[in-house]
Amino acid sequence: MIPKLIVFGGNGFLGKRICQEAVTSGYQVVSVSRSGKAPHSNELNDKQWMQEVQWTAADIFKPDSYHELLNNATNVVHSLGILLENENYKQTLSKSPTYDSKSRLLSFGAGPNPLKKSSPYFTYEMMNKQSAIILADTFKQKILKKSKKEQEKANQRSFTYISADKGFPLIPSGYINSKREAEIELEKMQRYFRPIIVRPGFMFDEHRNAIGPRSFIHTALELLYCGNKFLLRNKLQLLNDLIRPTVSTQQVSKSVLKNIENPDFKGVVTLEEILKA
């Protein structure tokens, strides 16, 4: 029987690479997102694996829109979340470098325009925490409908949550706090599935062109990390905690699949462990 992997946020920056790695590993892959569309890509390699994925639309806050997808599901991945409670920041990260985008980058921590109506769901509490809890609870309810014998096979099921290594400078503490709070709730469900908590740092994609604000941040963080490592020899713990290595979405994806396929693993996957994948 071909193993099935359902990725919520599967057309996102990291989610699509998890889908790609899963397809390569022989999984039947279902991507769930609001649009239900495959991500745009001009790369031939991307177009090939994308044809193997079932792209589906659903609202994670409305279990009725996706609960049937969880029938007989053994592995679920939550790859949703926000870094800022500002609905425009993801567009800023993905745009080509311009004076305007760099200016907005410098005011990255600024809140949303108070005159602009925003989604009530676009908060740390809802996107980073509640969306994961709602999905995990829906998965749990499906498991409870199985026979007692099947319910006891928790090690054969997994729920992967993409958390974060640490908070980032200029980013509100609500970001990392919401991630940690979600982790605590998911770990309470070990009776039903293996909670896999993945904690990457700032991510970049190995195959995307090195342009745009995300590339600007990646380069700056790499310079800081190398300076701390080779010039200061990592002697200052305060800097070690603040300046962390970046990690590619491909490395994170390999780590996710590696731990999903290990029936004995549950718990936290640190940034250091991800970098070894």
Swiss-Prot record:
Major subcellular site: mitochondrion
Pathways per UniProt: Cofactor biosynthesis; ubiquinone biosynthesis
Keywords: Mitochondrion, Ubiquinone biosynthesis
Subunit text: Associates with the mitochondrial ribosome. Component of a multi-subunit COQ enzyme complex.
Protein family membership: Belongs to the NAD(P)-dependent epimerase/dehydratase family.
Keyword Magnesium: no
Name recorded for this polypeptide: MIOREX complex component 2
UniProt gene name: COQ11
Additional record remark: Present with 1470 molecules/cell in log phase SD medium.
Changes seen on gene knockout: Shows impaired de novo coenzyme Q biosynthesis.
Any one cellular-component term (Gene Ontology): mitochondrion
Function text: Component of MIOREX complexes, large expressome-like assemblies of ribosomes with factors involved in all the steps of post-transcriptional gene expression. Component of a multi-subunit COQ enzyme complex required for coenzyme Q biosynthesis.
UniProt subcellular location: Mitochondrion
Any one biological process term the GO annotation gives: ubiquinone biosynthetic process
